[in-house]
Amino acid sequence: MKRIIICLLGAVSGLVAVPAAAQQSSMQFGGLMFSHDLMLAEDFASLSRPANFGTARAMALGGAFTSLGADMSAMSINPAGLGMYRRSEISLTPMLSVAQGETANTLPWQGNNRTRFSFANVGAALNIFESSSGSLVSMTLGVGLNRVADFNTRYSYSSESVYDAASGQTVPTLADVFSQQLTYHGIFPNQDGALGYDYVPYFWPAILGYNGFMTSQAGDQMVPDMIGHNASAIYSVDVVNSGSINEFQIALGANINNILYVGATLGIQSVHKKTGITYQEQYLYDGAPVDRDGTPLASKLDYASLYQQTVLDGSGLNFKIGAIVRPVAGLRLGVAYHTPTFYSLDRTYAADIESSISNAANTSREINTDRTPVLSDDGPNSWEFVSPSRLLFGASYTFGTFAIVSVDYERDWYNGIRVKNVPDGQPGFIIQPEEYKLEFKNNFCATNAVRAGLELKPLPVLALRVGGGYTSSMLKDKSLYFNRPVATESHYLTAGVGFTLSRTTVLDLAYQYAVDSYSKYQLFFSMDADAGQPVTWSGLYDTSITRHYIALTLGFRF
C-alpha cells in the first residue's frame, strides 16, 4: 500500500531529515520545523511514557501501589491488588489538569497554559466468589477505564536575532534553510514559476516557503531575495498538543489463604493526539532593506507564518500480571509485569502558510496564503509499534489502622521499542523498522522510576496522604536529540485527603504537581554531515512543562 495524499497528485511517501541513501552529498536539515510527515524514534518513545493517574487515593500516594490493593488503580498497576477486595465497589474519578509551558530566555507569545477536564478513572470491582473454606478465599472481577497519558500541553514564545552592522553577518532564518534544502535536492519551480506538491511530503514546508515568498529562484539556486541582508528577525513559536491515551481494562484478582494475591489485566487502549505547530518569522529593519550588495529592495517580506498539523488516532493492546505476598502481619511485597503494548496508529499531516509582502515605502501590502494536500497513513498502511515492557516491585508496611508506608521501583526498557510497520514509501525516503531498531538499541536506555507514599489516619474517618516520584531519562545522551523536545527526567509531588462518609461511601481528594524536563532543540538547522559543521542554525531552546492535577474520587461499596 502507498501513503495516501488527499488530492489529485497520487500516492507518494514521506522523507526523513537525512535521506543519505538517496543523496550523494551530506547536507542534513532538521529542527522543530522539519520531519512532521513521519514519526521519529522520539515520537514512539514519547507515546510510551505512562503517567501517574488513577483514583485520588493512588495518586495522592505517589502511585506507589504495586504492593497495595482494594483500589481501582490496581488494574493499571498490579492486578493482584484486586484480590484484597472483601466487598464490591464502584467509583469514578473526575480530574482537572492545568499544564504550563516555559522556555528559558524567551518572551511569551500566544499563551503557555492548557486546562482540561477529564476522567482519570472509572471502574467497578465485583466480588464474584467468596469461600470460608479452602485455599481460595475470594475472587474479584474488575472492569474499568483509566487514563494512562495526557498530551494536553502548550508552549509559546518569541526570541529575536539582531543584525550586526559591524560584522555584516546576516541573521539565521528558516527561509535560509528552505532555500538550501530546495537547492540541494534540485527542486525548482517550472517555467511558469509554479512549484506544486508533487514531491514527497518531507519537502512540503520548503515548497510552502517558496509559495509564501520566503525564497525564490536565482539561476541554479534558491535564495531568500525578499528578505534584506540587513534584516533582524523575530522567531515566534506556538506548539499546542491535545489528546490522551485511555485504557479499558478487564481484570481478575484472587486471594489465596489471605497470604498470596494474584491477578491479571487485559488492557485495550484508545489513542488520540493532535499537534499544531505555528512558526512565524517577522523581519525588521533599522533603515531601508537592502540586498547583499547594498541595493535597496523594491519589495520586502514582512513576515511568514507556517502552520503544521498532525493527528494521530489508534489503539493498543497489552497484558499485565502480578502477585502480592503478605509474609508477616503488616508487610506486603508486590511484583508486576506489563507486557509491551502493541499499537496500530493512523496518522494525518498537513500544513499551510501566510505571508505579507510590502513595498519599500510600506504604502502597499499583499497577504499571501497557500496550503498543502493532506497526507494520510491509515488502514494497512498505518504505523505499528510495540512499547517498552515494564517490571514493577513494591513494598509496603501497615502500622495497624494508623499508617501505611509504601515504596515502588519500576524499570521500563525503552531500548526495546520496536517498530513493526511503516507506510510503504519511496525507497530512501522513509525510515525502515530495522533502522528504528538500531536507533533504539544504540541511543535509548531503560528508565528507573521510584515512587513513595505515606498515609496517616488520625481519625477512623479521615486519612491524610503525601507522596512523590522520580523517573530517569530514556536517552543515553540527550544532546543527540535536538530535532524536537524529547521528555527526559520527570518528577512529581502529591498530597491528598480521604473521608469515610459512611459505611458504604468514601470521598478522596488528590493534588499532583509534576515537572517534565526536555532535551534542548533547534527550531531549524542545516549541517554538513561529512565536515560535522553547522551551516545555518537557530540556536538551542530549552522548554519545560509543569502540570497541576486535581482529582476527586467518589466510591460506593456494597
For each feature predicted by the language model, list its residue ranges.
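Active-site-proximal flexible loops/turns
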Residues: 9, 85, 274
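Bacterial Sec-dependent N-terminal signal peptides
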Residues: 1-26, 558
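Outer-membrane beta-barrel translocator/receptor signature
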Residues: 56, 68-77, 82-162, 246
